[in-house]
Swiss-Prot record:
It comes from Escherichia coli (strain K12). InterPro entries: YiaA-like (IPR038972), YiaAB (IPR008024). The keyword Membrane applies. The chain crosses the membrane at residues 13-32, 42-59, 72-94, 99-121. Residues 1-12, 60-71, 122-145 are cytoplasmic. Residues 33-41, 95-98 are periplasmic. Keywords: Cell inner membrane, Cell membrane, Membrane, Transmembrane, Transmembrane helix. GO terms for cellular component: plasma membrane. This is Inner membrane protein YiaA. The gene is yiaA. It holds the Pfam family YiaAB.
Length: 145
């Protein structure tokens, strides 16, 4: 696979961070202001943390496989399974919650925005490491001479 072209875009990186932080803050503010028991808030918080970790870990595993970095199938399948479980837990929790439909949609959108942000930020961090900005490349070339 010689067609591994990864580009780093500062604009996309900034938007990714905004999506990640915005999704997490929105989700947590919704939990903070929600009129639900503390154990329910803990459930939704744990689902968010599980989803963020599994999404970033799954993206990294897929990227490692694409770049030819050895990964085990068991870890790949574990990441995928945990990601699916986190989404299913949120869906089941919202389905059974005594919330308004608009509140359920709010939590769902904030959750998926956070997952997108986590994957995009992780991708951008990795791309920045592979293709550093040109100023950094010039500096490294000067030191190697």
């Amino acid at each position: 696979m010689d067609n591994k072209i990864s580009t780093y875009s500062p604009a996309f990186s900034i938007v990714s961070w905004i999506a990640l932080v915005g999704g997490i803050v929105t989700y947590l503010l919704g939990l903070w202001n929600a009129e639900m028991q503390l154990n329910e808030k803990g459930y939704y918080f744990a689902v968010l943390v599980l989803g963020l970790f599994s999404a970033a870990s799954y993206q990294k595993t897929v990227r490692d496989k694409y770049e030819g970095i050895p990964t085990t199938s068991i870890y790949y399948m574990t990441c995928l399974t945990v990601f699916i479980i986190s989404v299913a837990l949120l869906m089941v929790g919202l389905w059974n919650a005594t919330l308004l439909l608009s509140e359920k949609g709010f939590y769902g959108l904030a959750f998926f925005l956070s997952l997108f942000g986590a994957v995009a930020v992780q991708k951008n961090i990795r791309d920045a490491g592979i293709n550093p900005p040109k100023e950094t490349q010039v500096t490294q070339e000067e030191y190697s001479e």
